[in-house]
Amino acid sequence: MSTYFDLIMIPLQLLIVFFTIYYFTLSFFGLFGRRPEEKIYDEQKTFAMIVCAHNEEQVIGQLVENLYLLNYSDHLYDIFVVADNCKDNTAQIARQAGAIVYERFNDNEKGKGFAMDWMFQRLFEMERQYDAVCVFDAGNLVHPDFLREMNSRLCKGERLIQGYLDSKNPNDTWISGVFSISFWVVNHVWHLAKYNIGLSSCLGGTGMCISTDILRRHGWGATCLTEDMEFTMKALLEGIPTTWAHDAIVYDEKPLTFMQSWNQRKRWAQGHFDVANRYIGKLFVKGIKERNIVVLDGIINLFQPYFLFLLFLSFAVISINFILSIQMSYMLFYR
């Protein structure tokens, strides 16, 4: 019996050891300082600030007003709100706050990914064209220097950039507090660490900046539950890594209750598995063919939910083996 369990446990344990060493080693590069960088604060780039909102009348006005207070020339950026299948006053409140509002109604293609794809197409048809788009959630607040930091990164040639995801409400409940801590940790031991050693980070759904050249050339096309992860991997296949802007800060609202956090995590996990199933093979082939460590590292990013599953499976196998061992010992002792 133990031989069969060994056949299961040894590969599992080897994988767990590999990922543990990987995460442990990677974290050190995010704990001890940051990669030196020269910042370019000469305002050169133009931005389309896009907010996809579904029934967000309670918060959309505050975000639009906040975006108009950024430390960046007003004529270099415009604020667009996509009122996506809204049944409340989101569009009206956004207009009153000064945003350019587009209303979208589509019962067949629902979700943020579809709304973004729809809005990008309209951006490209406008007379005014922008150097980059920045995407936010309706419940966000944005640091005044956000666009200055993104402008600096774009001027240095970066094309796909994720900003620092801070917490808007860490003290509201213990759930929001735990979420906030997890994001603070991940920002340093994952995103910053990867940026410091030249690996690709990952888009986080909000606070992200995308060069319009990328969108024109490759399209958006990311419409699954985790459209940010999907586009990250799509871009990586095209040789475009995601960089990390540690000083471009966005304050994101975290879940307040256990059920809110559960539903959010479940949605993220479903989307993560979906993207992993579609992109791991493609990334592996490209990474091996080109001997590209950045692309191969993207596989580890996608493998995270499987790693958690392996931990659960390992615990289950150990528990079963322990119970069976006790039963066998009991039978031998009293035989």
Question: What kind of region is each of these model predictions?
Answer:
Residues 1-65:
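N-proximal low-complexity "stem/linker" segments adjacent to membrane-targeting elements
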Residues 105, 109-128, 144-225, 266, ...:
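Long helical/loop segments within the catalytic core of UDP-sugar-dependent glycosyltransferases
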Residues 45-48, 78, 230:
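Cell-envelope/extracellular polymer assembly enzymes that use nucleotide-activated donors
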Residues 1-9, 13, 30-41, 197-199, ...:
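Basic/Trp-rich segment in TM-proximal cytosolic loops or flexible interdomain/linker regions
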Residues 65-76:
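Short, acidic, metal-binding catalytic loop of nucleotide-sugar glycosyltransferases
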Residues 61, 88-95, 103, 145:
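Acidic helix N-cap motif at the loop->helix transition within catalytic regions
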Residues 83-91, 106-108, 141:
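A conserved acidic beta->alpha catalytic loop
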Residues 127-141:
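Short beta-strand-to-loop acidic/aromatic patch adjacent to the donor-nucleotide binding site
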